[in-house]
Regions:
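A structural signal for multi-pass alpha-helical bundles of membrane permease subunits
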Residues: 4-295
């Protein structure tokens, strides 16, 4: 017999049903398809053949550029996420204070994050141009340098520039996530700490950081996913040149699939990247949760 109690029991699931269907269609189903394709033979024309086991994975791992790409991806994620997190906390602490023009500074800070990554990378490409780049022009006009500097003289320096642009566009996201956590902290905690003789660093380590940890955890996990999957910066600035020396996993599998037409290994590489990303994000969340629980 139908009763209001039964309706209340199922009502939350009915409200969630549209979201669940969208996630299933656009997230879960494509993931299942990619996993299936990674174990299938795929021709250069994209024709799907039979089951080949782990052959695609073997070919992907044995490719000459695989080790370089994996190391680049590691340093790309570590440097961009790590440095942007530190700088984001610094900017959040600054913006949490009251000062004249704070709203203007906040608007300026959010601009790099809100602008298209392709535009950002293109602008930075122009700034560091050897012949007519703005950076060389400014330094020459100020008399700081006597002749133009080649800011992209090696692939190592180009990779550093990629990381720098990644940090530049990511800092605002971290800053505003942490700022939201800072603004939820009760001011009386700082007043009590001041009365007890606590200094700036004592308040930071014992009050601020522990209380903004939930916001920081969310921003870090999202940042890892966002940076790992970032395609426009690397592709716009270098396209992985020379010889995949500045490639990350995302740009490499794109080139592998659409330029070299090796769709099987590219699919396997995408699965490897997905599993690595899940492992890193999961490990970070578990570590943080254990610290919060005091285990």
């Amino acid at each position: 017999m139908y009763s209001p109690l039964n309706r209340n029991k199922w009502e939350p699931y009915l409200w969630l049903l549209p979201s669940i269907l969208l996630i299933a269609i656009f997230v879960i189903f494509p993931i299942i398809i990619v996993f299936k394709l990674s174990f299938s033979e795929i021709s250069k024309a994209g024709v799907i053949g039979g089951f080949v086991g782990f052959q695609n994975y073997k070919e992907a791992v044995q490719m000459p550029a695989f080790k370089t790409v994996m190391l680049n991806t590691f340093w790309w994620v570590i440097s961009v996420v790590g440095i942007s997190t530190v700088l984001g906390i610094v900017f959040a602490l600054m913006l949490d204070r009251k000062f004249h023009g704070r709203k203007i500074v906040r608007a300026i800070l959010v601009f790099p994050w809100a602008t298209s990554l392709v535009i950002q990378a293109s602008v930075w490409n122009y700034i560091i141009k050897y012949e007519y780049g703005n950076l060389n022009n400014v330094l020459l006009n100020l008399g700081i340098i006597k002749q133009a500097i080649n800011w992209r003289s090696s692939y190592q320096i180009e990779f550093i520039w990629e990381c720098g642009v990644g940090i530049f566009v990511t800092v605002p996201f971290v800053a505003f996530c942490v700022l939201s956590g800072l603004q939820s902290i009760d001011g009386t905690l700082y007043e009590a700490a001041t009365v007890d003789g606590a200094g700036f660093w004592d308040k930071l380590w014992k009050i601020t950081l522990p209380l903004v940890r939930p916001s920081l955890t969310v921003s870090t996990v999202l940042n890892i996913i966002y940076v790992f999957n970032s395609f426009p910066i690397v592709y716009t600035m270098t396209k992985g040149a020379p010889a995949n020396k500045t490639d990350t996993m995302i740009t490499y599998l794109y080139m592998l699939s659409f330029y070299e037409r090796q769709k099987g290994p590219a699919t396997a590489l995408s699965v490897i990247g997905f599993l690595l990303l899940c492992a890193c994000a999961g490990l970070y969340m578990v570590t943080v949760m254990r610290k919060e629980e005091g285990l």
